[in-house]
Amino acid sequence: MQAERPLWVPDREIVERSPMAEFIDWCGERFGRSFADYDAFHDWSVSERGAFWTAVWEHCKVIGESGEKALVDGDRMLDARFFPEARLNFAENLLRKTGSGDALIFRGEDKVSYRLTWDELRALVSRLQQALRAQGIGAGDRVAAMMPNMPETIALMLATASVGAIWSSCSPDFGEQGVLDRFGQIAPKLFIVCDGYWYNGKRQDVDSKVRAVAKSLGAPTVIVPYAGDSAALAPTVEGGVTLADFIAGFQAGPLVFERLPFGHPLYILFSSGTTGVPKCIVHSAGGTLLQHLKEHRFHCGLRDGERLFYFTTCGWMMWNWLASGLAVGATLCLYDGSPFCPDGNVLFDYAAAERFAVFGTSAKYIDAVRKGGFTPARTHDLSSLRLMTSTGSPLSPEGFSFVYEGIKPDVQLASISGGTDIVSCFVLGNPLKPVWRGEIQGPGLGLAVDVWNDEGKPVRGEKGELVCTRAFPSMPVMFWNDPDGAKYRAAYFDRFDNVWCHGDFAEWTPHGGIVIHGRSDATLNPGGVRIGTAEIYNQVEQMDEVAEALCIGQDWEDDVRVVLFVRLARGVELTEALTREIKNRIRSGASPRHVPAKIIAVADIPRTKSGKIVELAVRDVVHGRPVKNKEALANPEALDLFAGLEELKS
């Protein structure tokens, strides 16, 4: 039997020239330490968190005053405070660069394309921050945006942060109730919208939704031109004004930044909302900045002038992560719309034309490219691409292989995982270590990540809960409208005392990497054996006949049985032969325990706005329980397909 080999191994020159290696050497000199290897450095970053995060601040040249203390009450997760004396402004650190080089490059499908230089971006932010101040918006006020992933959105966020206000955003494909479920909780002082957007080659109208949401929020509304007629829409919206009129009275001048405490709120992000009204998760300016600087500069190796792309909407935390790339001087490549319009080459066309250094996307996208028969390795010049990242759901081992066979054989592939809760990653890529098929390379610097069993003991070689045992800067400041912190504590600290339990079912590998087997709350438990749903998806979704799958545990005869729903490829029927083939694939690729008791074909599978399937909502429908918040779904009508199924009555 041939020994397993890594898919990618960094060559010596890459290692020696990487910002990660440079940082390790710098820390050794700065603190008089010698680190034998990366693992030793990671251990130090966790045991000496004050020194480590001070090093990130100093090495990345954060603009602001750090104060004398880096960490207070570090042993208590909920009470820990990083840089309690610090003063800084998030936007000031993202707008340190000037000149005629590209800051933002944008494509809206094949309908719109333009770019902003650093000087143009700074000029726009200057006019916007003056307009915000004239509107009476300052520290602690909320600005809510229902916007595409376009340059104006980045500029508006930066202007909001520059005056100390709090930014919150969603994508324009949210329904009226979905927008209100989010922004209605935070009482924004200003509402920002587009006048339409493009998706799949068609203009999507938002006029009636904008009018209804603006009226309900009762806030002045700024309408940004994109795919409609903002001048015609503005007079029909209560408190409506076009972006041009909003900034008309202000000329670009020197930028003015409000320096505030490290823990001052920067963003309000939202949970998916599939189990109730979305939680409003508040993230700090300092914690977000330091964590993203660490991830971009060291884990991704981003350098000044390189081009960073992430396929995301403004309703997903990866948009916030992408925006922070400006802090290392990277050029952001923005895209809005369908990643398959006009065809599946569109993002690779973009990557080749603009010479992406980092291409970020989702596991679902990689699988769709593979199933679509696209092979960019043969059709595109991706010579500039050195790092590809994948998140949103676990990337299957076959997905790993496809990246190296079909996209680029010498790229570093970093599967990453974290979430809205920390606006960053717990586990991610590492330019100093090999990439192994199906594995995330390892934990982030400064993060005490581990896998624990139900008894709260660390485990190796078996699955358990992904935890973080020590405080870190990008923990939420609080949940909005949670004055006693009860919702916050229940979300992360109910399971283990003084330990963050993230809700992922995970496993360490012999290489020191991590495999995420799915969400803990969606874990299947037939016969008392815990099975991660991703273990089943990894087998089934590699089959050309299966477009998508969703798995639940159904309560049955005092036990739980595994039920697999499949959305089949066009023209395919679920015959007895295909059912046997699916079961055999699961049995041989996973184990006999993973084989579903029932396999049922459905026309569609419900998913969130960011493309994640919703196992818990389907499980509720199957068991006759109400789904609390269908507005959180991109296709809520799909839930009806799972109600009262005859196949599940026997």
Curated annotation (Swiss-Prot):
Disrupted-gene phenotype: Acetyl-CoA synthetase activity is not affected in mutant cells, whereas acetoacetyl-CoA synthetase activity is drastically reduced. Moreover, after growth in YM medium, cells lacking this gene accumulate PHB to 60 to 70% of cell dry mass. They display reduced ability to proliferate during the first 30 days of incubation in growth medium lacking nutrient carbon.
Record: residues binding ATP: G392, S393, P394, D504, R519, R530
Keyword Cytoplasm: no
This protein's UniProt keywords: Acetylation, ATP-binding, Ligase, Magnesium, Metal-binding, Nucleotide-binding
Annotated residues for binding of CoA: Y199, N200, G201, K202, R587
Enzymatic reactions: acetoacetate + ATP + CoA = acetoacetyl-CoA + AMP + diphosphate
PTM sites of type N6-acetyllysine: K612
Name of the protein described by the UniProt record: Acetoacetyl-coenzyme A synthetase
Organism: Rhizobium meliloti (strain 1021)
